[in-house]
A protein has these predicted regions:
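Oxyanion/phosphate-interacting regions
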Residues: 73-78, 92-157
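Acidic beta-strand-loop-alpha-helix segment within the catalytic core
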Residues: 1-94, 142-157
Length: 157
């Protein structure tokens, strides 16, 4: 990831198992996927509010299999009959980028190096990655190059 003024402005993520390369960011306002030999531009977020997304019945939410704690379960339980998409690592961001989920709640520890590149790709598509304070989503974006590289909890949408 390329970070400027504490914000991820460009990222590149390759997933060898899936042979997918994602790249893009806010500098260009777009993101791309190379899947094997095929290259396609990823679609921009519809920029729906988190409140509106949570209210939609059957909204796809991507969550970790191994880090699904009580806070994550409580968030999911507050949604309207969501469809859970399980995925590991920072690939959860990329599930949003591909349009296969609309919310990624993260209520477990991550480090900046775990999230920055995929976060940049998402932000290039107009998605939000807001921190959670006191168990509640804020309108504050996740920052990088902090003194403590541990990320706060966040929700991407």
């Amino acid at each position: 990831a390329l970070i400027q003024n504490n914000k991820p402005i460009y990222g590149v993520v390759y997933t060898p198992v899936l042979d997918k390369l994602f790249y893009g960011g806010t500098q260009t306002g777009e993101a791309w996927l190379i899947n094997g030999e095929a290259k396609s531009q990823l679609q921009h977020s519809k920029q729906e509010s988190l409140v509106d997304l949570i209210a939609q019945e059957g909204i796809p939410i991507v969550a970790s299999r191994s880090h699904r704690n009580k806070d994550t379960e409580d968030f999911i339980d507050g949604c309207n009959n969501p469809i859970i998409v399980s995925m590991g690592s920072s690939l959860k961001f990329l599930v949003l980028a591909e349009g296969n989920a609309h919310i990624y709640p993260r209520f477990a520890p991550t480090m900046e190096w775990d999230t920055a590149a995929a976060d940049a790709v998402l932000r290039g598509l107009g998605y939000n990655v807001f921190i959670v304070e006191g168990g509640k989503p804020t309108q504050k974006p996740l920052d990088y190059n902090k003194e403590d590289l541990l990320n706060p909890y966040f929700i991407a949408h």
